[in-house]
Design a protein with these regions (language model features):
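Non-catalytic regulatory/linker segments of enzymes
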Residues: 1-149
Length: 149
């Protein structure tokens, strides 16, 4: 199946960007199991390239780990951070979780690890969990401030 997926990947849009990206990557990611997918994502999507550069250890994990397990862990982390954190910390944690989920789902989708139905379900699950964590945080804050009893 990997050959079929590789055949469907678009070539990187900018080889110079891909070379600079690969030079900046740690060995674990640069020499990982899917250099074709890594190059395709880095060369075609500045957003995904930026996410991989920002957290190369997570990116390396996203290429090899079970995507469902990683998504479960991201969502569980959202639930935990909504408990007792200040607004700034909660917002930062939510942005970090969004970035990780976006990268993970993109890799699972373009790498052929998830069919469209699973990609859509993962996006929906993450959106639901993010919204629930935000509502929980807001309700706790309102209660703590005496605006909600």
């Amino acid at each position: 199946m990997s050959g079929e997926i590789t055949a469907r990947l678009p070539p990187p849009l900018d080889d110079a960007v891909v070379r600079r990206f690969r030079d900046a990557m740690p060995d674990a990611l640069r020499d990982g199991p899917r250099p074709d997918l890594l190059d395709g994502l880095a060369g075609a999507s500045p957003y995904l390239r930026g996410l991989m550069l920002a957290d190369p250890d997570f990116a390396a994990e996203a290429f090899v780990a079970n995507p469902q397990s990683v998504l479960d862990r991201i969502i569980a982390g959202l639930r935990m951070v909504a408990d007792g954190t200040c607004q700034t910390d909660f917002m930062a944690a939510l942005r970090t979780a969004k970035a990780k989920a976006a990268l993970l789902i993109a890799i699972a989708d373009t790498g052929g690890r998830w069919p469209l139905a699973e990609v859509t379900a993962a996006l929906t699950r993450f959106a639901d969990a993010s919204l629930q964590a935000a509502v929980d945080w807001l309700l706790r804050e309102a209660h703590a401030a005496g605006r909600l009893v």
